[in-house]
């Protein structure tokens, strides 16, 4: 008896410590997972915070109440499987959650007025109910923003595992409640801080918060799209010869059960790639088949064993954890790391061995078997008299339970069992062996699915009769068709089937036929399982024929009824039901499911394979894929271009999870290209530092000092080649800049519009204006010539690379891949056609020689052929702005000017008509002036000669210079008289200086020399004047 209070407290404290030591880890786990229930921030928690900030404390508490109620229902559903399946079925959540979130975002995306920003102060407000329901439904749908739902699954797993432990349940509830209280307090604290510390009006702050949360909800929608399973249809190869099978495969998804009709259960989770070293043979050092399982070391019974179902993520995490904890320093070998667990298992095994050894020793010492063998716990009650027999004790099994003695004497058999016939015994045994089938059948009927028979149920009378007719028809057809080509004719084992018995007189040549024969012999009726074993084509034929027979039966019954045969009046109800259900799908349902099997040879070639929809691995994006036929042999050449854009799907196995792909890290909000994490440091380094490092490796001083060598090097390079390379690089850069879907879409439409406007709008208008203006200028119009040249212009649609496709048809995927438009013989508007002018000029310039006259007699046909043969092939590419280039994305081609020939012709006529007349007038004036000064010039030359003799030395020196100049100009003095030549070759004779004899000598002088002659005469006159002044 406890007499001291301290002793009482010490006992209680010891019990509490023992409870804590026993259930301490569970309490900690419960608190942790209770807090972690509210840790994954989903839309429900976001709505709660939004309600606190925008609509006050009351609406925030109601939103948090809805979230809490949703969490509570989810936790309770763990212990009730129908509710758990209804709430957490992934495919149903996929189809419900996303539309609901999008609808909610559409409601809150725009703020029409400030009414939603007012605080809610009453529970009677309709907005309270709306907030509560939205928060509750978002929590029920259970979407979270974390990339992996492992945390929430661990909570459910631990709660289900330790639900019998009150400490864990209480601690989990306390942690969950504490997490929600913490969320409430943090939301209120955030609300107070925003109200007190905002520099602007709180109403404007609310507007910003409203807009921010609408963006957050939209981002949550996008994140759900990446995490939810997406409907994915597997492509199946169909045989062109079997059209019926192809149709059945196309409609097979209608007959699949939910959710396999929309969702792909064959989707890869952790796909593997097989890399081949040789493209032409399978003989490579790499093993041919790769396992789809991951092998790793695990512990089992105290030993390390190889497990083939290990998770790669767990193995990688374990290795990283060992490296982080530096296990090699703690223990020299990996065995010591698990030594404690191995020792525990070894102790348990040793205890078991020692216990068995002691029991054997007890038997040797004379103890009975009952005392030596371990006593089993039995079923009993308080009254020892009510202890049941060991035969009926449910806690005992094996040898401890009594055996019911079964007498082998036929005298103990009942009359009923003794009088059974052989057939009844077989039927009794079949029923005994098929208890499971009977139980399933009874449950199936209770579920009100009587119209859907089970595989072992017999066929109806109509179905049996149709099957017999069908098989007989196929047997008759077999005698006409070769047996090797008809697969269905091999299954002749069901030919002699009647309504009650099946005759085994048929040949079994295939496994399927053997199975049917065994079923027919073993059972006395035809069931739906026999129909299930038919091929797909045979089943479709059977059910179509069965439907036709139903219609015929209904028609015949109504005909009998109308004709007066009232024997079928009692079956009118069944006939109406048949008419109502005639178009329903077949009542046959297959009780089998295909196991997802993936190929173990996913080949990853070294080169990019051009195969759209054939390979299992996504290859590089191909643009402008087509075929080009060249040569006389008409060989098909593949024309393709790989996209220059970064491909985020390249080398990704179709249907696999995108988040599992390595080496495509995305660390920016908007990232244009994919990068490997290995090169992150290089790509993030600024270009300035990289350029300085490159410049440090170059000898800058030597490069700039040795300028002569650089000039020689540049001179050796071909300027033309450098220009071609530069333009090609520029064109490729422009093409890559345009190579993304939105730009290709806009550019392609612009090209088509420009082509149409040029061909049918702009050029016809210019031709009409030109010829009308020629009519106003009293010139002959050139309608035929212009329209002929316009009709020669052809617009050919090409791919983005410039490969010609067709004049009328557009390339495939032209909106996505882009296109080019090539103009052959582009039309240029001319002011006149040069053929007429050339003919006129040739007629005037050609002399009248006999051989030239014969040439002029060339026929018009030969002339047209010669012109067509000598015609140069011209083409250009149209740009999106209407210009022309020689190559795609090349420099703009300079077009011939329309006004330049006109201006040139006007200049020629100006010189010929006006300037020639003014030159003639000037020459006439010049000749008259020469005649007037003829005598005066000769007398002045004589005065110069006399003056040269009488002047002093200084003047003689000057005169000698003048004479030298006159001699250099071609003048000479003779004794007979003064005879001088002008610098232009004009002879002036003093004795015979009659200009009338040589009136046309000036016409022989060139035009330029006439102006020089006038200048020399002026200089000569100025010299004479200066000498006269000196004298």
Curated annotation (Swiss-Prot):
- Transport as a keyword of this entry, yes or no, is yes
User: Would the keyword Transmembrane be found if you checked this record's keyword annotation?
Assistant: yes
Q: Write out the entry's keywords from A to Z.
A: Chloroplast, Membrane, Plastid, Plastid inner membrane, Protein transport, Transmembrane, Transmembrane helix, Transport
GO cellular component terms given for this protein? chloroplast inner membrane
- Where would you find the membrane-spanning parts of this chain? 11-31, 68-88, 92-112, 127-147, 166-186, 212-232
Q: Name one GO biological process term.
A: protein transport
Which cysteines pair up through disulfides? They are: none
Q: Mainly localized where?
A: plastid
Q: Which InterPro entries match?
A: TIC214
How does it associate, per the subunit comment? Part of the Tic complex.
* Purpose: Involved in protein precursor import into chloroplasts. May be part of an intermediate translocation complex acting as a protein-conducting channel at the inner envelope.
What is the protein's given name? Answer: Putative protein TIC 214 N-terminal part
- Gene field: TIC214
């Amino acid at each position: 008896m406890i007499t001291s209070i301290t002793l009482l407290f010490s006992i209680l404290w010891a019990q509490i410590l023992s409870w804590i030591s026993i259930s301490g880890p569970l309490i900690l786990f419960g608190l942790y997972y209770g807090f972690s229930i509210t840790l994954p921030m989903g839309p429900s928690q976001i709505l709660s915070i939004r309600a606190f900030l925008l609509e006050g404390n009351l609406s925030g508490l109601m939103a948090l109440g809805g979230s809490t109620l949703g969490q509570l229902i989810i936790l309770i559903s763990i212990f009730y499987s129908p509710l758990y399946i209804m709430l957490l079925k992934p495919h149903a959540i996929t189809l419900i959650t996303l539309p609901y979130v999008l609808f909610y975002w559409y409601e809150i995306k725009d703020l029409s007025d400030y009414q939603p920003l007012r605080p809610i102060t009453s529970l009677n407000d309709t907005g309270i109910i709306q907030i509560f329901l939205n928060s509750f439904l978002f929590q029920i749908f259970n979407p979270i923003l974390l990339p992996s739902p492992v945390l929430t699954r661990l909570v459910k797993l631990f709660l289900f595992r330790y639900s019998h432990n009150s400490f864990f349940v209480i601690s989990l509830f306390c942690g969950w409640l504490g997490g929600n209280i913490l969320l409430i307090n943090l939301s209120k604290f955030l609300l107070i801080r925003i109200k007190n510390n905002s520099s602007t009006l709180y109403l404007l702050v609310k507007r910003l918060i409203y807009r921010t949360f609408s963006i957050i909800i939209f981002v949550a929608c996008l994140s759900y799209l990446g995490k939810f399973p997406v409907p994915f249809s597997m492509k199946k190869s169909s045989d062109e010869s079997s059209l019926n099978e192809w149709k059945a495969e196309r409609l097979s998804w209608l007959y699949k059960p939910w959710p396999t009709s929309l969702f792909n259960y064959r989707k890869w989770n952790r796909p593997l790639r097989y890399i081949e070293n040789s493209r032409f043979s399978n003989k490579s050092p790499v093993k041919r088949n790769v396992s789809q399982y991951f092998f790793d070391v695990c512990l089992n019974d105290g030993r390390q064993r190889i497990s083939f179902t290990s998770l790669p993520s767990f193995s990688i995490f374990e290795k990283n954890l060992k490296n982080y904890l530096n296990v090699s320093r703690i223990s020299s070998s990996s065995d010591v790391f698990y030594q404690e667990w191995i020792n525990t298992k070894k102790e348990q095994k040793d205890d078991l061995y020692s216990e068995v050894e002691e029991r054997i020793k007890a038997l040797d010492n004379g103890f009975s078997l009952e005392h030596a063998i371990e006593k089993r716990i039995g079923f009993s009650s308080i009254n020892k008299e009510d202890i049941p027999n060991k035969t009926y004790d449910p806690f005992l099994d094996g040898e401890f339970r009594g055996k019911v003695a079964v007498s082998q004497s036929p005298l103990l058999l009942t009359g009923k069992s003794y009088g059974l016939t052989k057939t009844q015994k077989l039927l009794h045994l079949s029923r005994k062996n098929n208890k499971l089938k009977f139980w399933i059948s009874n449950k199936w009927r209770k579920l009100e699915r009587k119209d859907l028979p089970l595989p072992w149920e017999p066929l109806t009378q109509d179905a049996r009769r149709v099957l017999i007719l069908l098989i007989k028809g196929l047997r008759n057809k077999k005698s006409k068709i070769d047996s090797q080509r008809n697969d269905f004719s091999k299954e002749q084992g069901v030919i002699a089937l009647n309504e009650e018995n099946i005759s085994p007189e048929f040949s079994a040549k295939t496994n399927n036929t053997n199975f049917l024969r065994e079923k027919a012999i073993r059972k006395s009726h035809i069931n739906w399982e026999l129909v299930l074993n038919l091929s797909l084509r045979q089943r479709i034929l059977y059910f179509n024929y069965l439907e036709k027979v139903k219609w015929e039966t209904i028609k015949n019954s109504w005909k009998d009824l109308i004709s007066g045969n009232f024997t079928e009046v009692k079956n009118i109800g069944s006939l109406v039901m048949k008419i109502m259900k005639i178009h329903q799908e077949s009542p046959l349902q297959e009780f089998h499911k295909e196991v997802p099997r993936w190929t173990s040879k996913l080949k990853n070639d070294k080169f990019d394979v051009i195969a759209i929809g054939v390979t299992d691995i996504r290859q590089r994006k191909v643009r402008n894929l087509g075929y080009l036929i060249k040569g006389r042999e008409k060989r098909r050449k593949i024309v393709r271009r790989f996209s220059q854009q970064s491909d985020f799907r390249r080398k990704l196995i179709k249907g696999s999870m995108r988040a599992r792909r390595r080496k495509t890290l995305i660390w920016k909000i908007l990232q244009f290209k994919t990068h490997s994490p290995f090169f992150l440091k290089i790509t993030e380094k600024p270009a300035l530092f990289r350029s300085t490092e490159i410049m440090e490796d170059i000898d800058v001083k030597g490069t700039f000092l040795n300028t002569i060598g650089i000039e020689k090097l540049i001179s050796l390079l071909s300027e033309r080649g450098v220009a071609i390379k530069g333009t090609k690089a520029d064109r490729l850069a422009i093409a890559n800049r345009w190579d993304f879907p939105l730009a290709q879409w806009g550019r392609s439409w612009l090209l088509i519009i420009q082509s149409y406007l040029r061909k049918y709008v702009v050029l016809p208008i210019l031709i009409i204006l030109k010829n009308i203006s020629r009519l106003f200028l009293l010139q002959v119009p050139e309608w035929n010539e212009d329209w002929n040249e316009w009709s020669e212009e052809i617009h050919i649609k090409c791919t983005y690379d410039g490969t010609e496709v067709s004049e009328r048809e557009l390339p495939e995927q032209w909106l996505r891949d882009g296109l080019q438009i090539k103009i052959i013989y582009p039309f240029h508007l001319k002011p006149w056609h040069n053929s007429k002018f050339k003919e006129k000029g040739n007629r005037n310039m050609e002399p009248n020689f006999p051989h030239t006259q014969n040439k002029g007699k060339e026929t018009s046909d030969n002339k047209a052929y010669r012109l067509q043969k000598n015609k140069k092939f011209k083409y250009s590419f149209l740009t999106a702005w209407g210009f022309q280039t020689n190559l795609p994305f090349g420099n703009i081609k300079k077009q011939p000017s329309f006004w330049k020939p006109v201006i040139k012709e006007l200049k020629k006529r100006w010189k010929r008509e006006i300037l020639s007349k003014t030159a003639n007038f000037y020459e006439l004036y010049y000749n008259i002036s020469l005649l007037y000064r003829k005598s005066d010039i000769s007398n002045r030359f004589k005065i110069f000669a006399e003056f040269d003799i009488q002047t002093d030395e200084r003047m003689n020196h000057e005169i000698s210079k003048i004479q030298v100049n006159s001699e250099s100009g071609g003048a000479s003095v003779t004794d007979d008289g003064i005879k001088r030549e002008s610098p232009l070759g004009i002879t002036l004779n003093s004795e015979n200086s009659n200009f009338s004899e040589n009136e046309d000598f000036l016409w022989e002088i060139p035009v330029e020399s006439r102006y020089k002659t006038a200048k020399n005469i002026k200089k000569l006159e100025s010299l004479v004047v200066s000498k006269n002044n000196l004298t």
